[in-house]
Amino acid sequence: MRSSLLLGLTVVLLLGVTVPPCMAGQALNKLMPKIVSAIIYMIGQPNAGVTFLGHQCLVESTRQPDGFYTAKMWCTSWTSDNPIVGEGRSRVELEALKGSIRNFVQTASDYKKFTIEEVEDWIASY
């Protein structure tokens, strides 16, 4: 009886340790469209600049000779210790920009540069 109790507690502890990252990933996936929309909106504003979670960022796109657009997003002041560059590529410039934003945000999340709560607060204040 004791061994089954210990086994049950071990399973509960293992599940408790492994579930939160999955839930954080799901939460980020749900927030991603709002993050991308907010940053795309900033790009469209004259002289506004892009600010993500209080950090100045650059988002740019370039049309390649093959007709595709490549886009990049980075925030040098925020990730200077470990540079993160989000990249996107598409025949449509807007889709390349969106891809670079998603890639940047996902990579920054993987490096634990922010919490889901910080992103939720940023979206709410925007």
From Swiss-Prot:
Q: Which gene encodes it?
A: AP
UniProt keyword annotation of Signal present: yes
Lineage runs: Eukaryota, Metazoa, Ecdysozoa, Arthropoda, Crustacea
Keyword field: Antibiotic, Antimicrobial, Secreted, Signal
- A Pfam family cross-referenced in the UniProt record is Anti-LPS-SCYG
Coiled-coil parts of chain:
none
What cellular component terms from Gene Ontology apply here?
A: extracellular region
Its annotated function is as follows: Has antibacterial activity against the Gram-positive bacteria E.coli (MIC<50 ug/ml) and P.aeruginosa (MIC<25 ug/ml), and the Gram-negative bacteria S.aureus (MIC<100 ug/ml) and S.pyogenes (MIC<50 ug/ml).
Q: Specify the domain of life of the species encoding this protein.
A: Eukaryota
Q: Which GO terms describe its biological process?
A: defense response to Gram-negative bacterium; defense response to Gram-positive bacterium
May I ask which residue range the UniProt record assigns to the signal sequence? 1-24
Regarding tissue, the record states: Strongly expressed in gills, hemocytes and reproductive tract, with weaker expression in muscle, heart and digestive tract. Not detected in eyes and hepatopancreas (at protein level).
> Where in the cell is the protein located?
Secreted
Name of the molecule in the record: Antimicrobial protein 1
